[in-house]
A protein has these predicted regions:
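Outer-membrane beta-barrel porins/channels
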Residues: 1-157
Length: 157
């Protein structure tokens, strides 16, 4: 017969503090501090569930600061910087190949008269280095970056 296994996973507990303040006409400064408690939220795949979890996510704190500007009734732009401190955890799971990050992002928002918003954004992230050792096999993840982009269409009523 086929082998079967049970997998358990859950999302961490989060605490987030958001702020925003107008700093000039049509200009907004915003930011957040987000803490994630991973201590009881690891991924576990049987038969490892009896020995140790499959993942080794670390508690984390993420800081974001950004500025938004309304250019006209139709156009707005925003830019942000985000950082998550490294945990210095060497790692025992290939599910966690990074340790902290720094990222910059930008977006443009076009608002139609009917309330539809079209947002186009891009984000560049510099991922924290990490060495992972799992069952005698090591993986070194150094100098990795990501570029992500997206388009969102929303209707506000």
């Amino acid at each position: 017969g086929a082998a079967t296994a049970n997998t358990t996973a859950s999302t961490p507990d989060y605490r987030t503090l958001n702020f925003q303040s107008g700093i000039a006409e049509d200009t907004l400064l915003y930011g957040s501090i987000r803490q994630a408690d991973w201590s009881n939220h690891q991924v576990a795949v049987a038969p490892q569930t009896q020995a140790a979890p499959t993942s080794d996510f670390s508690d984390s704190t993420t800081y974001t600061i950004g500025i938004g500007r309304k250019i006209s009734d139709e156009w707005s732009v925003t830019a942000s910087y985000k950082t998550e401190e490294a945990s210095d955890n060497t790692g025992t799971s290939l599910l966690t190949p990074t340790d902290g990050y720094k990222a910059i992002g930008a977006a443009a928002i076009y608002t139609l008269e009917n309330g539809t918003e079209i947002t186009v954004g891009i984000n560049y992230s510099m991922l924290g280095d990490k060495t992972v050792t799992d069952g005698g096999i090591s993986g070194v993840f150094d100098d990795n970056t990501t570029v992500t982009s997206g388009i969102k269409v929303a209707y506000n009523f």
